[in-house]
């Protein structure tokens, strides 16, 4: 998402602004709990560093969300449904000026031909991005996933 300008656009009043960086805000479950909470953490160049910081923030956070994080520009809402192989998901929107992209991915599965598939849904404000931009995201995601080992050794 980061290299695609349209994911950075937000509507404020009668203007369209571009935020400098995107900030993941995602749902997480604490061990032994069925009550999720929303964790917001700045992106890091190294995935391992991001994961460590996200785990630390999640463990330290006691409420549903950190209200100071919700006021930040550049949020991207992320969620996961690892139990479902879906064909579509609808997200809640705060109105026509809500420009925060929302991404949900589900349960991956192996096709008969051996390929792994991963369902995902992107809910974006059509005034800020179009199919061209979602197509660029899909291409970038495909390249990223092609570089992931299925069963990496540690």
Residue ranges and their predicted role:
Residues 10, 25-29, 39-40, 77-81, ...:
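Residues in well-ordered beta-strands of folded domains
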Residues 28-84:
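Helical lid/core segments from catalytic subdomains that handle acyl or acyl-like groups
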């Amino acid at each position: 998402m980061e290299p695609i300008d349209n994911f950075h656009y937000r509507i404020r009043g009668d203007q369209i602004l571009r935020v400098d960086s995107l900030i993941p805000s995602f749902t997480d479950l604490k061990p032994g709990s069925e009550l999720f909470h929303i964790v917001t953490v700045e992106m890091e160049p190294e995935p391992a560093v991001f994961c460590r910081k996200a785990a630390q923030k999640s463990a330290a956070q006691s409420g549903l969300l950190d209200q100071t994080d919700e006021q930040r520009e550049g949020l991207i809402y992320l969620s996961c449904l690892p139990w479902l192989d879906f064909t579509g998901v609808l997200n809640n929107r705060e109105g026509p000026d809500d420009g925060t992209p929302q991404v949900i991915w589900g349960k991956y599965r192996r096709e008969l031909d051996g390929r792994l598939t991963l369902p995902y849904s992107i809910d974006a404000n059509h005034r800020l991005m179009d199919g061209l931009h979602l197509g660029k995201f899909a291409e970038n995601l495909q390249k990223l996933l092609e570089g992931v080992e299925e069963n990496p050794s540690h």
